[in-house]
Amino acid sequence: MSERKAVIKNADMPEDMQQDAVDCATQALEKFNIEKDIAAYIKKEFDKKYNPTWHCIVGRNFGSYVTHETKHFIYFYLGQVAVLLFKSG
């Protein structure tokens, strides 16, 4: 599988957690092909590791406007796929 370059577009999150998000998304993309399944994997992993409630959107073309808890937001690309991950609630 080709190496996907991670490009962080926007983040309000500690750097170690950002790296976790990229690593988790990389694992998800290796395991799943359907964007919904990729998002579910990332969300569930972050719920386990950093406590609920995380939300994750994965896709190639979407807009967003969300409210998130301080220091719990990241938006990045992994290759052609965008990942929006944030904690709210």
UniProtKB/Swiss-Prot annotation:
CDD domains in alphabetical order: DLC-like_DYNLL1_DYNLL2 (cd21452)
Subunit-structure text: Consists of at least 3 heavy chains (alpha, beta and gamma), 2 intermediate chains and 8 light chains.
Annotated organism of origin: Heliocidaris crassispina
Database matches in PROSITE patterns: DYNEIN_LIGHT_1 (PS01239)
Record-level Gene Ontology MF annotations: dynein intermediate chain binding
Family: Belongs to the dynein light chain family.
One GO process term, biological-process aspect: intraciliary retrograde transport
Principal location class: cytoplasm
Keywords (A to Z) from UniProt: Cell projection, Cilium, Cytoplasm, Cytoskeleton, Dynein, Flagellum, Microtubule, Motor protein
UniProt protein name: Dynein light chain LC6, flagellar outer arm
A Pfam family matched in the record: Dynein_light
Domain of life per record: Eukaryota
